[in-house]
Amino acid sequence: MPFTLGQRWISDTESELGLGTVVAMDARTVTLLFPSTGENRLYARSDSPVTRVMFNPGDTITSHEGWQLHIDEVKEENGLLVYVGTRLDTEETNVTLREVLLDSKLVFSKPQDRLFAGQIDRMDRFALRYRARKFQSEQYRMPYSGLRGQRTNLIPHQLNIAHDVGRRHAPRVLLADEVGLGKTIEAGMILHQQLLSGAAERVLIIVPETLQHQWLVEMLRRFNLRFALFDDERYTEAQHDAYNPFETEQLVICSLDFARRNKQRLEHLCDAEWDLLVVDEAHHLVWSTDAPSREYMAIEQLAERVPGVLLLTATPEQLGMESHFARLRLLDPNRFHDFEQFVEEQKNYRPVADAVAMLLAGNKLSNDELNRLGDLIGEQDIEPLLQAANSDRDDAQAARDELVSMLMDRHGTSRVLFRNTRNGVKGFPKRELHTVKLPLPTQYQTAIKVSGIMGARKSPEDRARDMLYPEQIYQEFEGDTGTWWNFDPRVEWLMGYLTSHRSQKVLVICAKATTALQLEQVLREREGIRAAVFHEGMSIIERDRAAAWFAEEDTGAQVLLCSEIGSEGRNFQFASNLVMFDLPFNPDLLEQRIGRLDRIGQAHDIQIHVPYLEKTAQSVLVRWYHEGLDAFEHTCPTGRAIYDSAYASLINYLAAPEETDGFDDLIKSCREQHEALKAQLEQGRDRLLEIHSNGGEKAQQLAQSIEEQDDDTNLIAFAMNLFDIVGINQDDRGDNLIVLTPSDHMLVPDFPGLPEDGCTITFERDVALSREDAQFITWEHPLIRNGLDLILSGDTGSSTISLLKNKALPVGTLLVELVYVVEAQAPKQLQLNRFLPPTPVRMLLDKNGNNLAAQVEFETFNRQLSAVNRHTGSKLVNAVQQDVHAILQLGETQIEKSARALIDNARREADEKLSGELSRLEALRAVNPNIRDDELAAIDSNRQQVLESLNQAGWRLDALRLIVVTHQ
């Protein structure tokens, strides 16, 4: 190679060194100094892995002093290049810059610059980059983006609500599904969509203290959303890092009590500029016109400041119209400002609901009924629709569906309230109760007696709680020497049940973690029963491992022993046997226990076993739950209301279980209350609201589309290719499980989302649902999204050279494969990717500018090519540099037409969609006041900004491949 002192070269193997300068040479070697790092390299002159850096007219270069020059001419003087051009900061022309004075920190970012500088990538990285562009663009365009990545069953009614609400601007809704229908999952899906699309970035979740960990686990395990849990300690700690501690995290969970207890803390919460607020158990927010509770006022303050609000409640409005109004008032105080007016409005919706029921029944409509429909939808000419709906024509059903849809839009709260009931959703198992009455051991009798004497001053409530757990009373007196499990008949019964059902998985729930730990030891030591333990003292990872061991079919644990708090947020649908070693204090917790197994998707009827000790609070409670509320074998939406009204009497019976006088009357009274409330609920069921919330056929199709996407083999092939190239080890463990671990030769030292000790992944939804230790990989999983960002945000694979062995073409024929990206820059919240995601346009040009891309498919072509090592590649590039420049110019002239077509289509689509949405809502505003002014204004503003951003869209060269034909 001809070297001259002062020339600038770049290392082919260590491009991070920057620009090198020739500082010494002899007959056989040359020395380069790399000023940006201060390092020297000695190379052999004859075959050194370095490439001469030469810029061309039209390029912009930077001097070592920092000013830039636009090159007009390149001269050569004594083997050194001199660049002549216009200085950009002073606009001075005919400025010269000798190559020795170039900035040494020069980074080649354009694909063509990297190619000419010898920074040539491996061929497989170029292919990965193109696939990443192609798949990313396709994923952005998916109509159900944000709904596929969660570790959940594809349940239509949940998907329907999430799809509807998740795409709105700053959604403000009340999710009021019955227990077990998955409100938490619906809220998670909405959050996931809003965060993924950029519509929201900061989220605050406020829940009762006992549910904090459940939400933390659900958000992480199901949606890969890592929330920070704020309590007093975390708040104090964060005060050292920021004036407002809540600004130290983007995603926060805290308890309602934590939020309202301290005035300054509440102010900090209100000032933290959240995009979305989620409030669980919103029925605990007590409100009346005269005296709203402190909790209610705290949430009201937040709801006034946060644009998006999701309230979750399981209590139907029929059990308290005033509290129902209060929750709607939090969502839209302008719309729901007068309780009396609200009650009157609700009565007026009856005819709408009747009309829908009439249409759904499918019977011929009378003239009166047709007239009533005409009156209800009076502002539009629906005569043709009415005629079609009442005919025997093929389009009769479609006409009825459209009329139902029109009526839905007019329904008072259909945009702010969603409620599904078990009656309207299919797929739930039966629940069968098996009670086992056992004698009270003398040791417990003595302990209870002594406790009664010593605790005479205790409140009835405290005594009742003690009496529920006699083993705890006994242990308190006996201390560490107490071995209650040696005589407690429940332990003997449990061992007998487990040994006679060895092939079945059994979930055992008890109130305390200590009870679970002691039972595990007894089962293991006495009967050799494999039992996993699950309690609040364990980390999330430890609980995952326990859950995974329980889930394993052949070698896994037969039984999982859970404490009350430890089991929150976990579902074990693969098991159908539940043992309640003791009973919880209220019906909500009882339903939560059964809900661990009683979910949509449970394949078997649930067997609920309750071994209880006679003459204890357990015997009182088992009767009250079963005979008074029917809470074991059916969900009990009335449970909390009856529990609150019967609380004082019930506590007395629990505190003194031997006093049974009047208990039968209490049970009878509660049963009558339960039946009356249940009938009231059934009668007041809002069929229209249920139809709207359920989604019908549309929701079924959505679930089916996502299921088909689950079978996409492109994802598996791409992910494995990505892991290979990034340098992540893959170990196939069978059963559709793969273990990923970091290697020593990764593209980046720490791959975002991959733990240091690795992780287990699966591409199968069913496997992910039964194996909580396995991460469910979809296009929306952080591992894949981070991988796409890693490849596409840098220059990995942006320039390469390949050989094409093809005797039909002359040796040395040049082809250049160009990948342009058409894109628009805009704030993330505009969600521009719906219309114009970064879209790759591939060209395959010969030296005459003929584009062969349409005739030569990428993957087929890629398989015909072979790689070239970097050193040989650099020589090839230098030999054909002028030809490549000419082909690049031809590419620049051709891309404009394709790019303009893409941009024009995106503009048309955006205008049609956003204008159509705005027009529809403006028309509905006349008949449904629940459409907020700020929502209409936001859609209009969004439309204008989107169209303006699309006007500014452009294109750039993202990657190129030089192909040289050979016959060898």
Curated annotation (Swiss-Prot):
Please report the organism this UniProt entry assigns to the protein.
Answer: Salmonella typhimurium (strain LT2 / SGSC1412 / ATCC 700720)
UniProt keyword list: Activator, ATP-binding, DNA-binding, Helicase, Hydrolase, Nucleotide-binding, Transcription, Transcription regulation
Biological process according to GO: positive regulation of transcription by RNA polymerase II
Q: Which SMART domains match?
A: DEXDc (SM00487), HELICc (SM00490)
Taxonomic placement:
Bacteria, Pseudomonadati, Pseudomonadota, Gammaproteobacteria, Enterobacterales
Concerning SUPFAM superfamilies, the annotation shows: P-loop containing nucleoside triphosphate hydrolases
Its name, as the record gives it, is RNA polymerase-associated protein RapA
Residue span(s) of domain Helicase ATP-binding: 164-334
Q: Which gene encodes it?
A: rapA
Q: Which family does it belong to?
A: Belongs to the SNF2/RAD54 helicase family. RapA subfamily.
- Has keyword Nucleotide-binding? yes
Which positions in this protein are listed as binding ATP? D177, E178, V179, G180, L181, G182, K183, T184
Q: For the motif DEAH box, what are the positions?
A: 280-283
